[in-house]
């Protein structure tokens, strides 16, 4: 099922507040900024490799994963969507 950038952020924000058992998002938030940052860097390299070697379908998947980890970082640091939108 697809969702918008805003819907994903809302879902992740709810998970950060309700902390459902077994949630990968909660686990990532608990690991902290350093671990989240490492995931962002890892996913960025996977976006690049997908663009060069794996085609647009794989590229879209990797971009989605990058967006997920960026939003987790936003939530961890207390940034809202509006905090980011004002810089677009």
Swiss-Prot record:
One of its GO terms (biological process) is L-histidine biosynthetic process. Its EC number is 3.6.1.31. Keywords: Amino-acid biosynthesis, ATP-binding, Cytoplasm, Histidine biosynthesis, Hydrolase, Nucleotide-binding. GO terms for cellular component: cytoplasm. The keyword ATP-binding applies. It catalyses: 1-(5-phospho-beta-D-ribosyl)-ATP + H2O = 1-(5-phospho-beta-D-ribosyl)-5'-AMP + diphosphate + H(+). GO terms for molecular function: ATP binding; phosphoribosyl-ATP diphosphatase activity. Pathway: Amino-acid biosynthesis; L-histidine biosynthesis; L-histidine from 5-phospho-alpha-D-ribose 1-diphosphate: step 2/9. It is an enzyme of class 3 (hydrolase). It comes from the Bacteria. It is found in: Cytoplasm. Its main location: cytoplasm. Belongs to the PRA-PH family. This is Phosphoribosyl-ATP pyrophosphatase. It comes from Cutibacterium acnes (strain DSM 16379 / KPA171202) (Propionibacterium acnes). The gene is hisE.
